[in-house]
Amino acid sequence: MEQGIETVIIHIRKMSETWKKVLSYSAWASAVGSLVNTVAKKIISDVFDRDDLGADEANIIAELIVKVTALDDLFIPDSQSVQNSSGKNGTGNGDDVEMDLGTAPLTARFADKWLKMQYLGEVLQSNLANIRFLWFESSLSLEFTKQEVVDLILLSFENNPHVRGLIKDIKESEVKEMDEQW
């Protein structure tokens, strides 16, 4: 799996450079974002398709997610590329997205499963206390449904009173959760 991920990352970077020369910024970001989103969805679905997940496997997957998140650097806009984007295809038709150009990557804007994949990496490396914090005090509930978090817990931990307690608390929580599954 690691070799496959590295190959995909190289391919996305090559396509990014090729497309950057011929597409407006918004078209480029949408196209590259689509590729990145496909990788994120594949990683997420591969994890949820498992019957169990040992600590070593979880760490390997989390490390792969870290490698994929390095693609964030593609989505740090520079004012030159965005300003020149309307002239690249010669249309100047105003299809470019107006953006506040900061230093934060815009990856999540163009790859809707990006944050979910990043949270998955965190959950895979977390203990029960960290998962509790991520669900109740952080934004995990914005990216995962209650059932998805329960499934991840059951996938990663042996069934014991602490696991059952956390699952019960999550199921009974009033936390606003996202509506859509991967």
Predicted regions and their residues:
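Extended alpha-helical "rod" scaffolds
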Residues: 1-182
